Curated annotation (Swiss-Prot):
Protein's recorded name: Transcription factor S
Organism: Methanothermococcus thermolithotrophicus
UniProt lineage: Archaea, Methanobacteriati, Methanobacteriota, Methanomada group, Methanococci
Family: Belongs to the archaeal RpoM/eukaryotic RPA12/RPB9/RPC11 RNA polymerase family.
Gene giving rise to this polypeptide: tfs
ZnF segments: TFIIS-type: 62-102
Residues the entry annotates as binding Zn(2+) 1: 5, 8, 21, 24
UniProt-listed CDD domains: Zn-ribbon_TFS
Residues annotated as binding Zn(2+) 2: 66, 69, 94, 97
Amino acid sequence: MVEFCPKCNNIMLPKNGRLKCTVCGFEEELGNRTEEYELKEKIEAKKQEVTVIEDVDTLPTTRIECPSCGNMEASWWLQQTRCADEPETRFYKCKKCGHTWREYD
């Protein structure tokens, strides 16, 4: 069985009774599922270029609720994060607290 990270959608690998994301570091307890997971081969994660948006004042804004603070205004941008035949991912950054989250179409 393959598990994917709920934060960044990359594959999670079993390690010391836990599942760990190789990209963002998210961890999840395996509990009684340890026998389901056995690492057969280790494959190095592919490096991915990340665009850092620092000046959000130049980005378009929209009315959407921030899941962190409840503010109703965020800057947004699109980025191709998956295969070219799949839609772009929309990212939001709260204008009040700076929390960043993504939305898939």
